[in-house]
Structures are given as C-alpha cells and as structure tokens.
C-alpha cells in the first residue's frame, strides 16, 4: 500500500505514519527527516534547503521532488510506503503522481488529519525539534492554510482522499484510518 499523510504542523502526521508503517509492515518516508539528514550530511541539496527550513518556509519544489525521487528508488519501499510531509502544494501532488507513474507505482490514498489550528500550534510548541520556535510554528500553520489545502481538492477530485478527525487520541486516529482503509 502507498499512502501520503496530509495535515498541518502538529496534526499527528509523524505519529500516524509510524503507527501505520508498523501495522501495515511498510516503510515510512519523512521529508522532514530526509531534509534534516541532507543538511547534517552537508549534501548540496541540504545546503540549499537549510535557509528555507530556518525561516519555516517551504523548501522549493524542485529540491523536494529530487529528494523524494532518490528515496522512492531505494529497495526498502518495494512493498509499500507511507509518505509524511509531502506533498505540500497542489503542484507537488501532481509531480508526485508523475514521479510514481515514471517509477511504475501508484498512490492508493491521501489521508488528511484534520485538526484545529489551536491544537496544531499547541502540539508543535510541545515538541523538542529545533525548528519548532513560536514564530516558525505560526508561519508553518499559515503556509499550511495558504498552500496545502488545495491538495485536498486535488486528491478529492481523484477520489483518493480520506479525511480523518485528528483531534483525538493517537489510538483512535489509527483505528479510524484503518477502518477506512479496509472499507475502501
């Protein structure tokens, strides 16, 4: 199964991606981790992406798409994957579809974790990631509403969107996702 997890900062994407991967025995792909790894290894893409991450801005599409392309070519994703943190724009969603077609893969579902803005901010500020400072968190929430919401329309038009109430316990969120995956 090939899934993407969508939602704002602090919506529970990482938590649910981990749980789904464990339950479905597939690979988790996190763009946040890929970017942090690229920066820590001082790769060329990492050096170019770092200034955007420091400001809480979206890393340019061409950089992210190239990182995702490299990741989806690795052998550990053959049985399926959950992609967390990508796509973040409608353009990226379309590019992901093109990339998957090129790689002979197909996205099964886009899972949207719907969470109120106040909850996203509160959860994000409660984490210990270096880029979870108040002004950066607020900027990421603004970007989510400005640029990410059109993705929901993109996947909904293609009948691949599952919307989940993310403002409940992680266990209940996982149960809701699995119930919809088994029914659809």
From Swiss-Prot:
GO terms for molecular function: adenylate kinase activity; ATP binding. It catalyses: AMP + ATP = 2 ADP. Disulfide bonds: none annotated. Its EC number is 2.7.4.3. It is found in: Cytoplasm. GO terms for cellular component: cytoplasm. It comes from the Bacteria. Pathway: Purine metabolism; AMP biosynthesis via salvage pathway; AMP from ADP: step 1/1. InterPro entries: Adenylat/UMP-CMP_kin, P-loop_NTPase. Its main location: cytoplasm. AMP binds at residues 31, 36, 57-59, 85-88, 92, 140. Residues 30-59 are annotated as: NMP. The keyword Cytoplasm applies. Residues 126-132 are annotated as: LID. Consists of three domains, a large central CORE domain and two small peripheral domains, NMPbind and LID, which undergo movements during catalysis. The LID domain closes over the site of phosphoryl transfer upon ATP binding. Assembling and dissambling the active center during each catalytic cycle provides an effective means to prevent ATP hydrolysis. Monomer. Catalyzes the reversible transfer of the terminal phosphate group between ATP and AMP. Plays an important role in cellular energy homeostasis and in adenine nucleotide metabolism. This is Adenylate kinase 2. It comes from Nostoc sp. (strain PCC 7120 / SAG 25.82 / UTEX 2576). The lineage of its organism: Bacteria, Bacillati, Cyanobacteriota, Cyanophyceae, Nostocales.
């Amino acid at each position: 199964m090939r899934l993407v997890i969508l939602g704002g900062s602090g919506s529970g994407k990482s938590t649910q991606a981990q749980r789904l991967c464990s339950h479905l025995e597939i690979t988790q792909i996190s763009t946040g981790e890929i970017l942090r790894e690229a920066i820590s290894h001082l790769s060329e893409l990492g050096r170019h992406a770092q200034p955007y991450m420091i400001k809480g801005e979206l890393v340019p599409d061409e950089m992210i798409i190239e990182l995702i392309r490299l990741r989806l070519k690795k052998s550990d994703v053959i049985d399926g994957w959950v992609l967390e943190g990508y796509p973040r724009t409608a353009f990226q969603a379309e590019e992901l579809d093109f990339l998957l077609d090129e790689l002979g893969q197909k996205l099964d579902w886009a899972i949207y974790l719907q969470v109120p803005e106040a909850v996203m901010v509160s959860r994000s500020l409660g984490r210990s990631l270096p880029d979870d400072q108040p002004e950066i968190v607020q900027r990421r929430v603004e970007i989510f509403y400005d640029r990410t919401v059109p993705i929901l329309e993109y996947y909904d038009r293609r009948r691949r969107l599952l919307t989940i109430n993310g403002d409940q316990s992680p266990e209940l969120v996982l149960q809701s996702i699995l119930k919809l995956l088994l029914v659809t």
